[in-house]
Curated annotation (Swiss-Prot):
Its EC number is 1.14.-.-. Belongs to the cytochrome P450 family. One of its GO terms (molecular function) is steroid hydroxylase activity. CDD domains: CYP164-like (cd20625). Heme binds at C381. The keyword Membrane does not apply. GO terms for biological process: cholesterol catabolic process. The keyword rRNA-binding does not apply. Keywords: Heme, Iron, Metal-binding, Monooxygenase, Oxidoreductase. PANTHER family: BIOTIN BIOSYNTHESIS CYTOCHROME P450, P450, PUTATIVE (EUROFUNG)-RELATED. This is Putative cytochrome P450 140. It holds the Pfam family p450.
Length: 438
């Protein structure tokens, strides 16, 4: 009963309100529940843009303007929104009284849901272990893992689902290395990551909600035991180092048990699904543009910029939100304290004022790196360098190994709104080129 009431407060009633709003043409309602927007959001980007830089909806504001999005993300007049904070008051009351004690990536004490001074403390602690040297070592791991995974493909030629067999397998190895997950537990962590992905959405169906809760609770229970194991037998993984710093450091780096669990959970949710989506989106885009693959074979130095363009054109994270800390004027509009602005990152990344011919995939686009796929300001993604490395190495290695790979069907998109990617992507591999391990 408690789960049902929580679903009604967080999702069920919102689904009903959104269905009515869609018939009335409300843009926010369409963003939440319109199947056409989930299938192909690009026309919706342009429709919202036609209404101006800042669009008023029934419940909040919405922007697709790159400059405004950039400024809002960096503004001290706005803060991050905790999951469910912008629900109508009666639903917010019910949601708070029926939620469980499991952690959520968009609720305190997650890095995504706190502001200074806690945010500064968390970020300083994580940065102490997530160094450029650590990222460099993980890049080597990505390359070797990619080669190992593709070796298995070469042994079983034919049609394969590249998302299930490659795009999801590569980041789970990296995440497991960060969290110190033993090999026998990695399939469970993969399952937790896949189940938790829709947890960022509002208005999800009841059955999907149950699967999400199963994933979050399962991960929470597993993580409690895993952290205890790392305390008793620490390894050379980043999570063991983080535990040591967090529990023996000064007041600026100390973390309690709940905060440690929140960071580990964020690594899973933010580091897994987004990278799966980056790889899947990139493979699909490059399969659809063989002329770009030909250019990359002649000019492999273009791979880093190609990844930036993939991030810009098909952003793994579609949107975020900020709430006004005080009454403030934005784009000529007076926003009251407590009002929310939904920032449509994916649409801002196609703003024609910043990116000429914004819907075109151009691997040589000179300003591709100006995208907001990793946000900006104090909440800029801590794992951006690693995500870029996984994208570049994962895509380059895949297409180098299978130069004749072709799409073998339409594939299917993930049923999520905040995150965007492929759930299946069948390909015909073709002959494999031999590769030498680094």
């Amino acid at each position: 009963m408690k789960d049902k009431l929580h679903w009604l407060a967080m999702h069920g009633v919102i689904r009903g309100i959104a269905a009515i709003g869609i018939r009335r043409g409300d843009l926010q309602a369409r963003l939440i529940a319109d199947p056409a927007v989930a299938t192909d959001p690009v026309p919706f980007y342009d429709e919202v843009r036609s209404h101006g830089a800042l669009v008023r909806n029934r419940a909040n504001y919405l922007t697709v303007d790159h400059r405004l999005a950039h400024d809002l993300l960096r503004s001290d007049d706005f803060r991050v929104v905790s999951f469910g904070e912008n629900l109508p008051p009666p639903l917010r009351w019910l949601e708070r009284r029926t939620r469980g004690d499991q952690l959520h990536p968009l609720r305190e004490p997650s890095l995504l849901a706190v502001e200074p001074p806690d945010h500064t403390r968390y970020r300083k602690t994580v940065s102490a272990v997530f160094t450029s040297r650590a990222v460099s070592a993980l890049r080597d791991l990505v390359e070797q893992t990619a080669i190992n995974l593709l070796d298995r493909f070469a042994e079983q030629p034919g049609i394969v689902d590249v998302v299930g067999r490659y795009c999801s397998q590569l980041p789970i190895v990296v995440i497991s290395e960060i969290l110190g997950v033993p090999e026998h537990d990695r399939p469970r962590v993969l399952e937790f990551g896949e189940l938790a992905a829709p947890s960022l959405d509002i208005g999800i169906p009841w059955r999907q909600y149950l699967r999400v809760q199963q994933g979050i609770r399962g991960f929470d229970c597993w993580l409690e035991g895993h952290l205890q194991q790392l305390r008793h037998a620490p390894g050379d993984d980043l999570m063991s180092q983080l535990i040591q710093i967090a529990e023996s450091g000064d007041n600026e780096t100390q973390l309690d048990e709940t905060e440690l669990r929140a960071i580990a959970g964020l690594v899973l949710v933010a580091g897994f699904e987004t990278t799966v989506n980056l790889l899947g989106n990139g493979i699909r885009m490059l399969l659809d543009t063989p002329e770009h693959l030909a250019t990359l074979r002649q000019h492999p130095e273009l791979w880093p910029n190609t990844v930036e363009e993939i991030l810009r054109l098909d952003s793994p994270v579609q949107l975020t939100a900020r709430v006004a800390c005080r009454d403030v004027e934005v784009a000529g509009v007076r926003i009251k304290r407590g009002e929310v602005v939904v920032i449509y990152l994916a649409a801002a990344n196609r703003d024609p004022a910043v990116f000429p011919d914004p819907h075109r995939f151009d691997i040589e686009r000179p300003n591709a790196g100006r995208h907001l796929a990793f946000s900006t300001g104090r909440h800029f993604c801590l794992g951006a360098a690693l995500a870029r490395a996984e994208g570049e190495v994962g895509l380059r290695t895949f297409f180098d190994r299978f130069p004749d790979v072709r799409a073998a069907g339409a594939g299917s998109r993930r049923d999520t709104r905040v995150l965007r990617g492929w759930s299946t992507l069948p390909v015909t591999l073709g002959p494999a080129r031999s590769m030498v391990s680094p």
